């Protein structure tokens, strides 16, 4: 068996990382260790590595004292409720055996996956990096002092964007509540206006949520972000959309428009 592991920059991350990796090794499972990473990066790494699953060590947008495990299947997708229940059942019953010393798992470090992820994004047919370069955008990025402070500026800079970094040191000391809600984003809203930036980007610690700030310092809500992206994608590739109950009616309207 082989499992891909990545973590956000939480202060407890190295401790939890050592615990999880060494437990897997003790069970005879090989580990591909991505080090500091993002949830979407681990998701793409699992099938690329032909791994049996993945684990992201993160508590997502929860405050810094939290930490947890996000579990992925061999497709790099989150486990179903049924599979999650099986994992808990095995753990609670302690229905597992550690490997003998000749059958321990091996750890392989691969810290290239954030760069690989960026390359994959830039190669998407719907991403026109050359067009973005002609616009000479200036963008403020709030990485909440986690791994988003690495990957988001690097992606933007490869598209010719001038990046103003705010809280982009991956030290795990979150300068504000990491959930990207309006009431937590006063600093970036102010900086976007001060820097005369075109817009701002805020991500949560494991970079599976983001919010945009307009050039006037006002938040461009998550529901509008989804609709704007869907409008662009459907204009190039007409089709259907699937959403959850928290999505606005606007997504349905945009889908029907195309």
Residue ranges: model-predicted function:
Residues 1-8, 138-140, 239-245:
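Short glycine-rich phosphate-binding loop at a beta-alpha junction
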Residues 2-66, 154-213:
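N-terminal small/polar loop signature for handling phosphorylated ligands or for N-terminal nucleophile
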Residues 7-8, 36, 57-60, 69, ...:
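Fold-independent oxyanion-binding glycine-rich loops
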Residues 13-18, 84, 149-153, 252:
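Short, surface-exposed alpha-helical segments at coil->helix boundaries
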Residues 67-195:
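Gly/Ser/Thr-enriched, mixed-charge loops and adjacent short helices
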């Amino acid at each position: 068996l082989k499992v891909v592991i990545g973590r956000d920059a939480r202060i407890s991350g190295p401790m939890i990382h050592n615990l999880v990796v060494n437990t897997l090794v003790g069970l005879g499972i090989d580990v591909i260790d991505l080090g500091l990473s993002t949830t979407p990066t681990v998701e793409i790494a699992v099938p690329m590595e032909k791994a049996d699953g993945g684990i992201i060590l993160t508590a997502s947008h929860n405050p810094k004292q939290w930490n947890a495990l996000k579990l992925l299947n061999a497709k790099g997708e989150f486990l179903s409720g049924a599979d999650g229940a099986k994992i808990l059942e095995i753990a609670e019953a302690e229905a597992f055996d550690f490997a003998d010393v000749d059958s321990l798992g091996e750890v392989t470090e691969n810290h290239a996956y954030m760069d690989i992820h960026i390359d994959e994004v830039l190669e998407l047919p719907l991403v026109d990096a050359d067009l973005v370069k002609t616009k000479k955008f200036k963008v403020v990025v709030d990485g909440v002092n986690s791994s988003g402070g690495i990957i988001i500026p690097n992606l933007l800079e490869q598209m010719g964007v001038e990046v103003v970094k705010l809280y982009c040191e991956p030290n795990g000391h979150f300068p504000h509540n990491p959930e990207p809600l309006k009431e937590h984003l006063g600093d970036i809203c102010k900086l976007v206006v001060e820097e005369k930036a075109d817009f701002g980007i805020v991500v949560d610690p494991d970079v599976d949520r983001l919010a945009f700030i307009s050039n006037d310092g006002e938040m461009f809500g998550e529901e509008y972000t989804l609709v704007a992206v869907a409008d662009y994608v459907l204009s190039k590739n007409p089709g259907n959309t699937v959403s959850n109950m928290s999505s606005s009616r606007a997504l349905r309207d945009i889908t029907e428009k195309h």
